[in-house]
């Protein structure tokens, strides 16, 4: 599987920080960012982090499998069950979990799946999420671990190296 994307840029006249503040309101997410580099700014929001390292462990939380929320809690629970039963969504999700395991094993040990196919609700979507963890020693080069796991499988596809070659 290859994840294709396109570059998009647009000139904008106005207060981009107000656009960012509006984004925070319409798409509240655990990870929000705004970088002002003088000549250009980058901002966004995401429920996903690439790699987290804390207290001797490294974590990747693959997110694959997404359904739009309806605004009706009962209907959303039904959709969550459909998501868990969907063969295509599950196949993609398991592929990303396996990719996270492989990526973490390059620079860390004792790789394991902490939870698999957990449903998480966000303001506009329902996601299927897993957590893959690995042990890291104090001597682990965290930047090397980041490089070993970059880019996330949700951005590249799998098998990662071949997908990246085809994308390039």
Predicted regions and their residues:
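Extended alpha-helical targeting/anchoring segments
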Residues: 1-168
């Amino acid at each position: 599987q290859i994840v294709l994307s396109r570059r998009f840029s647009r000139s904008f006249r106005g207060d981009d920080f107000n656009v960012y503040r509006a984004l925070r309101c319409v798409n509240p997410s655990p990870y929000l960012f705004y970088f002002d580099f003088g000549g250009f700014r980058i901002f966004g929001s995401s429920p996903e982090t690439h790699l987290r390292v804390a207290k001797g462990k490294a974590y990747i939380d693959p997110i694959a499998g997404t359904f739009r929320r309806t605004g009706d809690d009962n209907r959303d629970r039904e959709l969550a069950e459909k998501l868990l039963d969907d063969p295509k969504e599950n196949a993609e999700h398991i592929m990303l979990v396996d990719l996270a395991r492989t990526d973490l094993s390059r620079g860390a040990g004792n790789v394991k799946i902490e939870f698999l196919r957990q449903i998480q609700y966000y303001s506009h979507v329902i996601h299927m999420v897993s957590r893959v963890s690995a042990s890291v020693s104090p001597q682990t080069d965290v930047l090397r671990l980041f490089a070993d796991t970059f880019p996330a499988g949700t951005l590249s596809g799998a098998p990662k190296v071949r997908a990246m070659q085809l994308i390039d």
